[in-house]
Every structure is written in structure tokens, then in C-alpha cells.
């Protein structure tokens, strides 16, 4: 009888401890959450102390992807699934290696202190696809600020936007060329400087100020010789890609990188390397990125993703996230388009 009581007491103690650890609340930017992630047996990724964010409100500035209602997505543009395309999907695929002549694919940009991820993810993938689908004839970088400021149906500029309408705008209105503020080439360069996003590096800290959305200029910088209207690059079609791993892979293999959004949780703010999956913390908002490929490491399938927080962040500007189970809704809202 005593043995039974002791066993039950031990079990209760174990369960209480287990529940306590599972439900423990960590400060998002603390040493405690970093230790918890790095010591977690099933994490699969490494966390590192960050000096980028001063608060969660500061972090939320970067989360500029707004969800498009499913009914509106279906109404505004078609959804492709590629079920009619029978092809062997490789275990690893990297658009940078598949199309090495398209320089934009390997370019990591910086959205700075503006919730313009939705615009960056879009113009980055559009630039890639323009080059790929033109056979290298349109090897350009398209302007994030042209889309950010002139697409009224996309959202609120630096305060966030919707992915789908950005691609529709590319088809209807076109987007001009650009580069970073530092390089200052093309028709309409990005006006905000590169800065360090929760890491230490060669750029100045991003600071606590969110930039106001610039006005829509519809003119090129003075030294650029091509008129604004003649510098426009347009797509022929925009469409949703079905929430399906193989459909997304086929789309990337055939036409190039895609734009997607995912839910950012508190633990992601501390990401340094590895294959991310949500371990702890609450949702902060949506973030738009560019999926350029996939792979498998230690039997874990992943998406290879280009971020817009410059090359000092994460894995040289990239990160990986678990593939095939809609981790953090990464496969739920994938957008793409074609130029021909």
C-alpha cells in the first residue's frame, strides 16, 4: 500500500514538473528563452542573444504581412496545383544553383525600419522570375518602394500590406527598377538605409523609429536616363499556389522562387541557424519572405528561404523552416506569377 502511494506521489510530481516546463512563460528576448531553445531535445535549430529589438512592439514593426481572406484570394486570382505535371521532385533544390545567371536570386535585401516585407518578398520573386522566364534577358532588380508607395490596393505601406494584390499590381501597372539606398542605381532606389536586425554587424542599429511611407512619385531619380513609364516591368499573370508541398515545389522548379508569408512567434526573434520550427512563445504577426528551394538535413525536410533583414541575419540572410506540414502557416499563402 505504501509503495502504491509513493508511486502515485512520484507520478504526480513528475506530471506537475512536466506541465510546468511545457507551460513555462519566457520573456521573448531573454537568456532564458535562448537557453530553453538550445537545450530543447527536439528544437533542431540554434538561438542566439539579440540586441536588435528593444520590445515586442519594436519587433512587430517588421511583421508587415497581412492575411488575405480565403474567399477574396479565390475570387481575385486562380489557384494552381500542377497535378497535371508529372515530374520527379529532387530531394534538394536551390534556385541559386539552377539559374546562376540570374543575380537577383542570390541577393539579400534589407527592408530597414519599415513593415515592407510584403513588398520585398514580392519584388524579389518577381525579379527572379523576370530573369528566369526571359532566359536572362530581363536581369533586373525591381523596386520595392515603387510597389510600396503606389499600390493603393496592397495595404498601408510601411504599416503592412497584402501579398496577392502586390502581384496583381505587377500585372496591371508594372514596377520599375531599383537597388538599395547604398547602391542607388535604377529608376527608384529604396530610400531607407540598411541596418542591423537583432544582431551585431557592420551596419548601424535599426533604432526605434519606424519610417513613414513615402509618397508615390511615379518619376525616376534624376541621373537615371529611362523615363518612369518606359522602365516599367510587367507580369502577364498572377496566381495563388495551392497549399500543398508538391505543388509549391513544382512551381519553384518550373518558374522560379515564390513569395509566401508565415506566422512569426516570439522564439523566431532569436533564430540564428538550423531548421526552424515553433518551440515556445506567442504569435507576433505575419512576415513575408521568398522561398527559393528546399532540402533535407538529418532526415528533416525544410524550405530554403531568403529573408529581407540583410545578410548579417540568420544563415547569411537566409533561414530554413520545416517543410511539408504547414509549419507556422508557411504553405498556406503562396503567391506567384509569370511574364509569359
Curated annotation (Swiss-Prot):
Active site (record annotation): 117, 287, 307
InterPro entries in the record: Papain-like_cys_pep_sf, Pept_asp_AS, Pept_cys_AS, Pept_his_AS, Peptidase_C1A, Peptidase_C1A_C, Propeptide_C1A
Tissue specificity remark: Intestine (gut).
GO BP term (any one): proteolysis
Annotated EC: 3.4.22.-
GO molecular function (one): cysteine-type endopeptidase activity
Cystine pairs: 102-131, 114-158, 150-216, 151-154, 187-220, 195-206
Propeptide section residues: 18-88
One Pfam family named in its UniProt record: Peptidase_C1
Signal peptide as annotated in the record: 1-17
UniProt keywords, alphabetically: Disulfide bond, Hydrolase, Protease, Signal, Thiol protease, Zymogen
CDD domains assigned to the protein according to its UniProt record, in alphabetical order: Peptidase_C1A_CathepsinB
Task of the protein: Thiol protease. Has a role as a digestive enzyme.
Family under the similarity heading: Belongs to the peptidase C1 family.
Protein name (Swiss-Prot/TrEMBL): Cathepsin B-like cysteine proteinase
Organism: Schistosoma mansoni
